[in-house]
Amino acid sequence: MIKSRFAPSPTGYLHIGGARTAFFAWIWAKKQHGKFVLRIENTDLERSTQASVDAILQGIDWLGLNYDEGPLYQTDRFDRYKQIIQQLLDEKKAYYCECSKKRLQILREELTKQGKKAKYDGCCRNKNLHTGVVRFNNPKEGIVVFNDVVKGKISINNQELDDLIIARSDNTPTYNLTVVVDDHDMKINIIIRGDDHINNTPKQINLYQALGWHLPEFAHLPMILGNDGIRLSKRHGAVSIMAYRDAGFLPEALLNYLSRLGWSYGNQEIFSINKIVQLFELKNINKASASFNQDKLLWFNQETIKSSSVKNLLSNLTWHLQNQEIIIKDTPNIEIVVRYLQDRCKTLVNMAGELKMFYQDFDTFDEKLAKKFFKDKTPLKRLFVELEMLNTWKADNIKQVVKQVCFELNIGFGRVGQPFRLALSGDGNAGSIDIVAELVGKNKALLRLKMAIDF
């Protein structure tokens, strides 16, 4: 059975790169009818925070990446790590090192001057010490070879590898040790992660082999860059995943876009999550870096809003309505309003903002627009009279009244439509005025027209 995992370190929020890694690992487990594990790698006690843990869990939950096991915490497994470290020490596959930071710094500088790779020289390897950090006794000969599912065959000479530290002087284990022990104990057989981890893989493979454990498969995902070709950072949009929720993005739109950062299926761009699971193949992930484009993500969001069910939109709108303190009343029917708005809104923030005009009264108008469109009140006054006499308050009838007023006053549509739009919305941000007027309702529409006339 396939078993994948997402194993973030809680030293910050869940960002775009981490979300894509989690999604690909989740997809692969679902596609293979396997299991997806969430593990929190929090052994770095100085940098790990509960706030970061909460942010990661919130992001995973919002994205809908349900996990079969977890969240599992490395801090609950210290006894197991100590057991493995002691085993390696007993088998002479690890040793204590008391080299000072100063000595190591001098060593690095000397090797760098000589044009050599800066790595530990094994000074304490045969001293039989009993205190200090613990280093893994990396093989001195041979080549580490592995077939990465994405990158292909990768090999590195053991002479290039360091005797990595697997336990700090305070006895806490380090990343490369804990990740190997966890993946083995949790029966993870496919490790999907960013290619910034690829240099760790040969070291971890040597640890697997020293412990006599079966190797998992590795799949290293290409880096995500900004449009300028530089590694993604905050200025490109590498913000917390929850910032995208706050900005009005649908989780499935974000996931759809993230899937396209490295994976493709012909020329098709919009997929349901189920379709991505069906079509996705790790071997089809591009080796080259992917570029993050905020405008493209916005397009994905707009298209997803258009095709989403009203039920799904309402579910995701709830947070935004609460955030903007919008209280939904019985009329007009919220489902009808959302169905109208979904073809014109790029984000849920836009949609929530436009919902206001249907449910919240206002007592003023955009001053700049009012000076422009309320200068001549004749069209509004005429429109008020005709609409007040209208017996059947439907969009088609309202449209005919607007056309009639334009004809009677011998003016273009804009001379009537723009003032009417501003009167209905307060800020001029409304779509088809006939549909908006119908949804707002006759009484409220007439009250707003009267307020515009008196403004």
Swiss-Prot record:
A Pfam family name for this chain? tRNA-synt_1c
The alphabetized list of GO BP terms reads: glutamyl-tRNA aminoacylation
InterPro entries, per the entry: aa-tRNA-synth_I_cd-bd, aa-tRNA-synth_I_codon-bd_sub2, aa-tRNA-synth_I_CS, aa_tRNA-synth_I_cd-bd_sf, Glu-tRNA-ligase_bac/mito, Glu/Gln-tRNA-synth, Glu/Gln-tRNA-synth_Ib_cat-dom, GluQ/Sye
Presence of keyword Signal: no
Q: What is its main location?
A: cytoplasm
Kindly state one GO CC term assigned in the UniProt record. cytosol
- CDD domains named among the record's database cross-references: GluRS_core
Which PANTHER family does its entry note?
GLUTAMATE--TRNA LIGASE, GLUTAMATE--TRNA LIGASE, MITOCHONDRIAL-RELATED
Q: What is this protein called?
A: Glutamate--tRNA ligase
Q: Which gene encodes it?
A: gltX
